[in-house]
């Protein structure tokens, strides 16, 4: 591979970053995958697979591993960031001085900035300036299924139409990976944060033993909360009926591959927050997202009762069953009301 001729550099060698890198490479593109741990990258190079997360999926020949950040960023103008939301800004500040002058940045990170609750587009603009084209991909994607080449569909939004077109062409694979473009940059970002919160609630409901009726009601009312918050932020309500909204919400709330759902189930079964996090063993994005989404809702005056009760369980010690009873005991309302 020419040192400056890769189609994409992927920043983040966890399960999802690796799965996206495999997907791009399987499409015939030269891809560089960078990880912050040199020992981990050396292991990936040796094994030609990510044995920790995706042990049954060998790397295509066009997937190249790199532990030197400068070398990785020099390899391509297209940078795909796949890191947890709480380190997103830190990673962007780290890569900024090493990026090529023609660089374009897309992220698959789902969530909001830790502590501030800002959209990641605002974090990116602050870290990188106003000139660089930005994009986000989001949707119902479990890493194992994506890496295995099973049919998957996502949404893509960008500040730059040329970048959006290029990304759609790079990522789209007629056999397994369908990429829908969407001009709603805010909505595509927001859906991925709120669904993490609702998935914890769905897990709690199932952990308590409430059944399919309750789970479905929670998903539906969770979608209403997502849509209300999105409208307050200027998103297009139609976005939340697409891949980055309803699609991701249903997937994360109903399948046990979801860490957020499993975390919620443990809480519903009576486990404490810290023990549940330790048992999951990986980042549970919804834990931080709950606090951030709640703060964002308060800032914009949006009522989100499900989010509020999940916050009470995670941060105030409320019992999951008590939280559920609080929701069930709310005053009667018109289903179409804004609260």
Swiss-Prot record:
It catalyses: sn-glycerol 3-phosphate + NAD(+) = dihydroxyacetone phosphate + NADH + H(+); sn-glycerol 3-phosphate + NADP(+) = dihydroxyacetone phosphate + NADPH + H(+). Its EC number is 1.1.1.94. One of its GO terms (molecular function) is NAD binding. It holds the Pfam family NAD_Gly3P_dh_C. Keywords: Cytoplasm, Lipid biosynthesis, Lipid metabolism, NAD, NADP, Nucleotide-binding, Oxidoreductase, Phospholipid biosynthesis, Phospholipid metabolism. Sn-glycerol 3-phosphate binds at residues 110, 139, 141, 195, 248, 258-260. InterPro entries: 6-PGluconate_DH-like_C_sf (IPR008927), 6PGD_dom2 (IPR013328), G3P_DH_NAD-dep (IPR006168), G3P_DH_NAD-dep_C (IPR006109), G3P_DH_NAD-dep_N (IPR011128), NAD(P)-bd_dom_sf (IPR036291). NADPH binds at residues 15-16, 36, 110, 143, 259, 283, 285. GO terms for biological process: carbohydrate metabolic process; glycerol-3-phosphate biosynthetic process; glycerol-3-phosphate catabolic process; glycerophospholipid biosynthetic process. The active site is at 195 (proton acceptor). Pathway: Membrane lipid metabolism; glycerophospholipid metabolism. It is found in: Cytoplasm. HAMAP family: NAD_Glyc3P_dehydrog (MF_00394). Belongs to the NAD-dependent glycerol-3-phosphate dehydrogenase family. This is Glycerol-3-phosphate dehydrogenase [NAD(P)+]. It comes from Escherichia fergusonii (strain ATCC 35469 / DSM 13698 / CCUG 18766 / IAM 14443 / JCM 21226 / LMG 7866 / NBRC 102419 / NCTC 12128 / CDC 0568-73). The gene is gpsA.
């Amino acid at each position: 591979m020419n040192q400056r001729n890769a189609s994409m550099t992927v920043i983040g060698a966890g399960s999802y970053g690796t799965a996206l890198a495999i997907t791009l490479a399987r499409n015939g593109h030269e891809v560089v995958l960078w990880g912050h741990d040199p020992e981990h990258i050396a292991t990936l190079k040796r094994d030609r697979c990510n044995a920790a997360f995706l042990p049954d999926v060998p790397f295509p020949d066009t997937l190249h591993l790199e532990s030197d950040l400068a070398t990785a960023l020099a390899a391509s103008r297209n940078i795909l960031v796949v890191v947890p939301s709480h380190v997103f800004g830190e990673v962007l500040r780290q890569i900024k001085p090493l990026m090529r002058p023609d660089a374009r940045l897309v992220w698959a990170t789902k969530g909001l900035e830790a502590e501030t609750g800002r959209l990641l587009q605002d974090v990116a603009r602050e870290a990188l300036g106003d000139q660089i084209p930005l994009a986000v991909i989001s949707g119902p994607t479990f890493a194992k299924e994506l890496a295995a080449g099973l049919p998957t569909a996502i949404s893509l939004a960008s500040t730059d139409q040329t970048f959006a077109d290029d990304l759609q062409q790079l990522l789209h694979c007629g056999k397994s990976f369908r990429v829908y473009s969407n001009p709603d940059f805010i909505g595509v970002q927001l859906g991925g944060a709120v669904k993490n919160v609702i998935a914890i609630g769905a897990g709690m409901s199932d952990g308590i033993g409430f059944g399919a009726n309750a789970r479905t009601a929670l998903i539906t009312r969770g979608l209403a909360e997502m849509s209300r918050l999105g409208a307050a932020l200027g998103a297009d309500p139609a976005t939340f009926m697409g891949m980055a909204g309803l699609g991701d919400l249903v997937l994360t709330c109903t399948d046990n591959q979801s860490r957020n759902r499993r975390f919620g189930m443990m809480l519903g079964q009576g486990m404490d927050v810290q023990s549940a996090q330790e048992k999951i063993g990986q980042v549970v994005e919804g834990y931080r997202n709950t606090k951030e989404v709640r703060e964002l809702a308060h800032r914009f005056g949006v009522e989100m009762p499900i989010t509020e009760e999940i916050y009470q369980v995670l941060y105030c010690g409320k019992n999951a069953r008590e939280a559920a009873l609080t929701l069930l005991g709310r005053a009667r309302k018109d289903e179409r009301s804004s609260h």
